[in-house]
Amino acid sequence: MKFEITKFQSLNYMGHEAFNTLSANLSFAGGDIKKIMVTSCSPHDGKSFVSMNLMRSFSQIGLKVLLIDADIRASMLQKRYGIKIQDEGYKGLTEFLAGRAKIEEIIAQTDIPNADMILAGKTVNISFPLINSGHLDELFGAVVDQYDIIVVDTPPIGAIIDAALIAAHCDGVLLVLRSNYTTQAELKDAISQIERSGKPVLGTVLNQFDTWKFGKKSESHKYYYNNSYYRDNSSKSEKGKEKKKKNKD
């Protein structure tokens, strides 16, 4: 089975460099850090954007990577990135957690070399029983030795319990923050929940940093990871749309 990703925007030079730095830093975290959860404090912070670009960056440095879309309540990843599925009867993570699909049925190659994906599948309103079913342990146990890196894109941490539960199955957490939006209280609460899972915060990514607000005329947003950043070029009209309607995560 294969997925075709039809709406994956190319990054500019700074974007490639920043994600290369981020993926390299994460790969240097140690051999015991393979399952990396990517989450945020609230919807529309850009966690899925970071997850997808991490998948691409890891694959470009020669690592075999698996991206798991674990937002089984409200995933927009397939729609946003125009992911076309060859098999119309594809079953995703939800179906596997419910015991209605096998592991080999939910993993698919993408058109990016070295990069495989598991999509969320059918969305559900109540996810707690599925995440706690024991099948998540089974999944990670089966794939951890097949890949160099596993990126797990989860719902935002805090509003619902899903991300905190999934964190317990991962080796560390990357937290995506939205510039001029994420509050200190939200950040503290997110870190507290991650720490209660017993897993380390591997780093934070500052997303949608707008240089216009700081007197520098630039039609771009900067995204920071520690001392690295990239610009995602966007027009003023896109910024206007952001004010009227939040971009889907």
What does each model-found stretch correspond to?
Residues 2-5, 188-249:
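Hydrophobic micro-sites
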Residues 58:
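Aromatic pocket-lining residues of Rossmann-like dinucleotide-binding sites
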Residues 47:
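Conserved lysine of the Walker
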Residues 76-77, 126-128, 184-185, 211-216:
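Switch/connector loops and helix/strand junctions flanking conserved nucleotide-binding motifs
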Residues 37-39, 119-120, 152-153, 175-178, ...:
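Conserved beta-strand segments of the P-loop GTPase G domain that flank and frequently precede/overlap
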Residues 50, 54:
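Hydrophobic positions on the alpha1 helix immediately C-terminal to the Walker A/P-loop
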Residues 2-16, 20, 24-31, 40-44, ...:
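P-loop/Walker-type NTP enzyme "switch/lid" segment
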Residues 142-148, 159-180:
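Inter-motif core of Ras-like GTPase G domains
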